[in-house]
Amino acid sequence: MAPSSPRPALPALLVLLGALFPGPGNAQTSVSPSKVILPRGGSVLVTCSTSCDQPKLLGIETPLPKKELLLPGNNRKVYELSNVQEDSQPMCYSNCPDGQSTAKTFLTVYWTPERVELAPLPSWQPVGKNLTLRCQVEGGAPRANLTVVLLRGEKELKREPAVGEPAEVTTTVLVRRDHHGANFSCRTELDLRPQGLELFENTSAPYQLQTFVLPATPPQLVSPRVLEVDTQGTVVCSLDGLFPVSEAQVHLALGDQRLNPTVTYGNDSFSAKASVSVTAEDEGTQRLTCAVILGNQSQETLQTVTIYSFPAPNVILTKPEVSEGTEVTVKCEAHPRAKVTLNGVPAQPLGPRAQLLLKATPEDNGRSFSCSATLEVAGQLIHKNQTRELRVLYGPRLDERDCPGNWTWPENSQQTPMCQAWGNPLPELKCLKDGTFPLPIGESVTVTRDLEGTYLCRARSTQGEVTRKVTVNVLSPRYEIVIITVVAAAVIMGTAGLSTYLYNRQRKIKKYRLQQAQKGTPMKPNTQATPP
């Protein structure tokens, strides 16, 4: 080892001796600057001076890396102290002929915190609940000048000095609706303005708070209680009092079938509407679910829907088209658990089948046989109907009501001859006079003398034919005058006869009363006898 290696211990020894046994002389050691504040890892120039002109020894004692700057003279030295990581008190010392002395400079290191961190917030926070904010700060100096601030946006919630390592500051916030979407953060303030420097701030990463309100009441679910296979139903789920309603998630499902609702939002409510289709695979009792999820909470409503299969009843005719007089069997069959009624069947215990026997008549043509089936599903009565029509083939018919046998019309008047033939199939009708002259049935004609006569109306179809004679009488104007004269004479004679009768009757009554008065016989009042 080099002989000079133990020499650094000498100044330290001199410093110690000078401090313990200061010399009797007037020599003094001074240091400049006496106080310094500098950033961590920084450098500073320290000047050590002594009052004697020829000091035996002049230097600085410090664990810091140092570099002496050469200056003229023997009583002053300048040192560059570098990489200052923490507070330090370098000491200048001198040894003069008249004594030893020392002087200290105070180095204060400042640095901003290495970590400023706000504890993560819950993803959702219910309105009306307390939220605890927690900020941790590691490092930073000088601690006497370091403050921790909790913020909502730019609003201060709490301010405390940084104490401990790591320093921790907490506060509690009562969550409100208007806190939704607010940013919370933590900030440190290293205030060195009194030392002639500036205010150093460090801010944590912000966290955005999401608040919510989910009422304790379950959602309202409106749906059919029963649903038929291969049909569609509508499901509506709604809930009021939500915040923020746009963040609410709605899940609708029938059994394992997820529904796709259309959601309509109000100020603090929503309504979700969905169509549901069911098949034979869904038959039975299924669970309908409406779940509303908001934040980290949910509300759910369950209902049961009964899926059923109920085909319309089957109406069976022996033949849909029969001839008159044919025996016809009408059957009605439905679901095994259904109860059916068939019109025309007398009252009887209801079951899944009903039957009717009849002999086809013309009146049965076009007759509808209606079968009504009723099935009870989950306490509800479901009704289905089916109708079949019977066609009866029968021969033509011509009767007085629809084809009068005698028409009397004034000459030159407008008339429409009407004659309706009935039958199935509808027969062809022709009315001919003398086998050649047709009567224009259903057409408006001017009545002439040629129209007068007897016509043979023939109705013909595949089921046979029928004939009927009709007579057309045409009245000429001269016959009308005769008729009017006869009628007028009859009216006059009738009036004269009635007048003569009334006159003779009054005369006889007067004569009778006169005779009675002459005999002195009182006349009995013509009063009604009193009943016993």
From Swiss-Prot:
Q: Where is this motif: Cell attachment site?
A: 152-154
Q: List GO terms (cellular component aspect).
A: cell surface; collagen-containing extracellular matrix; external side of plasma membrane; extracellular exosome; extracellular space; focal adhesion; immunological synapse; membrane
Q: Write down the species.
A: Homo sapiens
Task: Mark the residues carrying the PTM Phosphothreonine.
Answer: T521, T530
> What are the glycosylated positions?
N130, N145, N183, N202, N267, N296, N385, N406
Which superkingdom heads the taxonomic lineage of this protein's source?
Answer: Eukaryota
Induction info: Up-regulated by coagulation factor Xa (F10) in atrial tissues. Up-regulated in atrial tissues by rapid pacing resembling atrial fibrillation.
Localization recorded for this chain is: Membrane
Maturation and modification: Monoubiquitinated, which is promoted by MARCH9 and leads to endocytosis.
- UniProt feature coiled coil, ranges: none
Report the family membership. Answer: Belongs to the immunoglobulin superfamily. ICAM family.
Q: Which residues lie on this side of the membrane: Cytoplasmic?
A: 504-532
Task performed by this protein: ICAM proteins are ligands for the leukocyte adhesion protein LFA-1 (integrin alpha-L/beta-2). During leukocyte trans-endothelial migration, ICAM1 engagement promotes the assembly of endothelial apical cups through ARHGEF26/SGEF and RHOG activation. (Microbial infection) Acts as a receptor for major receptor group rhinovirus A-B capsid proteins.
In terms of PANTHER family, this protein maps to: INTERCELLULAR ADHESION MOLECULE, INTERCELLULAR ADHESION MOLECULE 1
Segments on the Extracellular face = 28-480
**Main subcellular location:** membrane
Q: Which residues cross the membrane?
A: 481-503
Which example biological process does GO assign this protein?
membrane to membrane docking
Q: Which UniProt keywords apply?
A: Cell adhesion, Disulfide bond, Glycoprotein, Host cell receptor for virus entry, Host-virus interaction, Immunoglobulin domain, Membrane, Phosphoprotein, Receptor, Repeat, Signal, Transmembrane, Transmembrane helix, Ubl conjugation
Protein name per its UniProtKB record: Intercellular adhesion molecule 1
Concerning InterPro entries, the annotation shows: ICAM (IPR003988), ICAM1_3_5_D2 (IPR048679), ICAM_N (IPR013768), ICAM_VCAM (IPR047012), ICAM_VCAM_N (IPR003987), Ig-like_dom_sf (IPR036179), Ig-like_fold (IPR013783), Ig_sub (IPR003599)
Bridged cysteine pairs (disulfide): C48-C92, C52-C96, C135-C186, C237-C290, C332-C371, C403-C419, C431-C457
